[in-house]
Design a protein with these regions (language model features):
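Donor-binding/catalytic cores of nucleotide-activated saccharide
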Residues: 93-206, 213-229
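A conserved acidic beta->alpha catalytic loop
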Residues: 41-50
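C-terminal subregions of glycosyltransferases and related glycan-biosynthesis enzymes
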Residues: 214-256
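Short aromatic/hydrophobic "clamp" motif used to bind/position activated sugar donors
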Residues: 88
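Short alpha-helix within the catalytic core of nucleotide-sugar-dependent glycosyltransferases
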Residues: 21-25, 49-53, 77, 85, ...
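Cell-envelope/extracellular polymer assembly enzymes that use nucleotide-activated donors
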Residues: 4-7, 26, 36, 193
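Glycine-rich, basic loop-to-helix element that forms the pyrophosphate-binding segment
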Residues: 67-83
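Short, well-formed alpha-helical segments that are part of the catalytic scaffolds
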Residues: 15-29
Length: 256
């Protein structure tokens, strides 16, 4: 297969079958065909790995990466390092994306020559769904110092941009600056910590105000669980975030 335009990275660990199948099928039916789909089986003890292998038999664009369990951050990094596309997109294994997400975001990224494309998010609770409120201008290209303002917005969750998903990221930006998820931060605010480092190096971005990404609220998921281990990881995340802010080139804007 020729080098794909977009590499979709899907971490998979103990995802209920109906969610996992919908997630994978939503990536397979993208209108942008020149993609690769990396299903990262993070040592899931159930049938997730076999389900991933099943889909790989049906679609040559799918690669299944089986690895020892290391957590969400580890799985994302594993996929990112194996990716071959010009652009990286993270999709969690229990979420799904609209058919035109890759095409629309890829076209915007190429046309505007930016390093990051962001889109809207729909939060699905099962019987109801709510579109996240974003306070970014639709179609606006952010450059230079405006990207520093975006970095500041991560800390106030303005527009819910402090997540790894719902983004198309220039792979070269990640690799050149060695921007990977901190694998010590297995859960909690790991997306915020990752994005702070990403936006530190960011020179251009665009926001598309369409909810292409469907976040499925699963009360049994790692991120939704409230236990001592989860709280411990959250504390570690914010300790890392404080340390980052103290040494950031943009620390005056980031401090309260």
């Amino acid at each position: 297969m020729m080098e794909p335009f977009v590499s979709i990275i899907v971490p998979v660990y103990k995802v209920p079958e109906q969610y996992l199948r919908k997630c994978i099928e939503s990536t397979m039916t993208q209108t942008l065909k020149k993609i690769e789909i990396l299903l990262v089986d993070d040592g899931s003890p159930d049938q997730c790995g076999e389900i991933c292998d099943e889909y790989a038999e049906k679609d040559k664009r799918i690669r299944v990466l089986h690895k020892k369990n290391g957590g969400l951050s580890s799985a994302r990094n594993y996929g990112c390092k194996a990716a071959q596309g010009k652009w990286i997109m993270f999709v969690d294994g229990d979420d799904w994306i609209e058919p035109d997400m890759c095409q629309t975001m890829y076209s915007a990224g190429e046309e505007k020559q930016v390093q990051l494309v962001m889109c809207g998010i729909m939060k699905d609770y099962g019987k109801s769904a709510t579109e996240y409120k974003f306070y970014l201008e639709d179609g606006k290209v952010y450059k230079g110092q405006e990207c520093k303002w975006l970095q500041q917005q991560l800390l106030v969750y303005n527009g819910n941009i402090a997540v790894a998903y719902s983004k198309l990221i220039d792979r070269k930006l990640l690799l050149d600056n060695q921007i990977f998820h901190d694998e010590v931060l297995r859960q909690g605010a790991e997306g915020l910590e990752f994005n702070l480092r990403l936006f530190e190096k960011l020179e251009s971005a665009i926001f598309i105000n369409k909810p292409f990404y469907h976040y499925i609220y699963n009360e049994n998921s790692i991120s939704a669980s409230h236990n001592e281990v989860n709280h411990e990881f959250v504390i570690k995340c914010f300790e890392k975030i404080k340390a980052f802010i103290d040494t950031s080139d943009n620390k005056e804007m980031l401090k309260p």
